[in-house]
């Protein structure tokens, strides 16, 4: 949604990380003390709230002070990494600086470990597609993206649209963090996002900001990435050679 509004949000990595951190905090402090179902509910709310907070901060500065969102959101990534590093060192009981996978408070596994992740991703993609195409908010996002002056002229509250849209983007990133920590890795570290925020920029541009087409471009990028990894193993290519291919 943010890119469709021409708000260049480069902070998805940080927004995902704070979602991971919020989920890990719930698992660490509440896991084993309260029922897992209650922990899961608190995790969901906390991860989404953390993602929203991390996205709304630059949105507020953009809306009220005209701050460059590209630089601001990029810097927020490094702050998120620092926060994660601090809490991991605090929680690591063995002095290794590594938080080992936690067994309590995990999200329930449906069919397989990755099925729920894929299901949620498809569900969010469909919901966002409907939201952008058929809702008043989606129309306002398109108008603001095309021309801020036109949006103001027809009575759209641009500041409100910017903040609301970034809150939605942050919420989605928070859900991603929730799934990474609560459903797949059961821990957190500063590299857990795997650079997916920057990969998402490429897939979104390839899809021309169309949520449904993003599914196809994500598969395309995944095929290339995994295929090149297999080529490297089969033919002994270097990492640099496969990256260039």
Task: Give the predicted meaning of each segment.
Residues 1, 34, 51, 58-59, ...:
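Alpha-helical transmembrane segments in inner-membrane proteins
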Residues 1-30, 44, 48, 52-67, ...:
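Single transmembrane alpha-helix segments in multi-pass membrane proteins
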Residues 12-20, 39, 43-51, 69-77, ...:
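Alpha-helical transmembrane segments of multi-pass membrane proteins, especially transporters
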Residues 21, 41, 45, 49-57, ...:
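Generic alpha-helical transmembrane segments of integral inner-membrane proteins
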Residues 23-26, 78-84, 174, 221-231:
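Aromatic-anchored segments of alpha-helical transmembrane domains
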Residues 69-134, 187, 239-242:
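Transmembrane helix-bundle core of multi-pass membrane transporters
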Residues 110-187, 211-212:
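Helix-loop-helix "hairpin" substructures at the membrane interface of multi-pass membrane proteins
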Residues 167-173, 179-245:
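Transmembrane alpha-helical segments in multi-pass inner-membrane proteins
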């Amino acid at each position: 949604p943010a890119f469709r509004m021409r708000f260049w949000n480069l902070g998805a990595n940080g927004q995902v990380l704070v979602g991971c951190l919020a989920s890990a905090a719930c698992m660490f402090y509440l896991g084993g003390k309260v029922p897992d179902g209650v922990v899961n509910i608190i995790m969901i709310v906390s991860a989404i709230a953390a993602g929203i907070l991390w996205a709304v901060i630059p949105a507020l500065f953009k809306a009220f002070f005209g701050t460059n969102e590209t630089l601001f959101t990029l810097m927020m990534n490094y702050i998120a990494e620092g926060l994660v590093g601090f809490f991991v060192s605090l929680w690591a009981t063995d002095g290794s600086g590594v938080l080992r996978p936690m067994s309590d408070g995990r999200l329930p596994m449906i069919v397989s470990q990755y099925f729920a992740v894929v299901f949620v991703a498809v569900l969010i993609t469909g919901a966002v597609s409907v939201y952008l195409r058929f809702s008043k908010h989606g129309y306002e996002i398109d108008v603001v993206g095309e021309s801020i002056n036109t949006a103001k002229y027809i009575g759209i509250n641009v500041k409100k649209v910017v903040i609301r849209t970034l809150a939605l983007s942050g919420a989605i990133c928070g859900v991603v963090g929730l799934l990474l920590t609560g459903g797949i890795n059961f821990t957190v570290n500063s590299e857990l996002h795997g650079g997916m925020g920057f990969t998402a920029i490429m897939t979104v541009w390839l899809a021309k900001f169309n949520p449904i087409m993003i599914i196809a471009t994500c598969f395309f990028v995944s095929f290339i990435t995994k295929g090149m990894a297999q080529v490297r193993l089969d033919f002994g290519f270097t990492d640099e050679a496969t990256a260039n291919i």
